[in-house]
Amino acid sequence: MPGAFPLVGTMAALQEEHFQGADMPTIDPSLRPGKVSKWGEWVKSKPLAVNGVETRWRILGKYDLVSTNEDGTIGLIDCKVSDSQRDTGQFYSPQLEAYAYSLENPAAGKGQTVASMGLLVWKPTHAIGTSVDDYGFGVFQKYIPIERDQENFLKVIGEFITVLEGELPEPGAECATCNYLLARNALN
């Protein structure tokens, strides 16, 4: 998605770089003692199970920040540069739960317990600088904790996999895509 919005990738990279090695309580006092120890790494889960049966489906994603906490757990932070009202825990919960699932159930290696997850939002508020060489943006920073809800995440992803693996429904007369595919397949 950052390719569609060129500055999003640049701003996200600046935000991630800024917090490399940061003490978690300096990001937000509500966070457990620890330090940001990883950033921008890919995670891949073991195969997901639906109704106790292993599927061919896995989760693959790239998180922004992970902390190693003093109590042996980890924290997960997704960085956002935005002024959107949708920057809420509810909107981003599935994304963070997917990363958390992958960290706790990795395809290889030992899983780690994700004790906290949240959004670190930078909202640009003003321009700063006094010369051509040092202009920038000031931001309002807000940490938004996201409650873990792995049970709901696994339920929704299970329903999604069931649809993907299920029988294809009969095409409807009003479905333009269905009609196109039927006509296209008839050419073969």
Predicted regions and their residues:
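A generic fold-level signal
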Residues: R58-L60, F91, E170
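An active-site-proximal "capping" alpha-helix that borders the catalytic cofactor pocket
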Residues: S93-P106
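Metal-dependent nuclease catalytic cores that hydrolyze phosphodiester bonds in DNA/RNA
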Residues: M1-T73
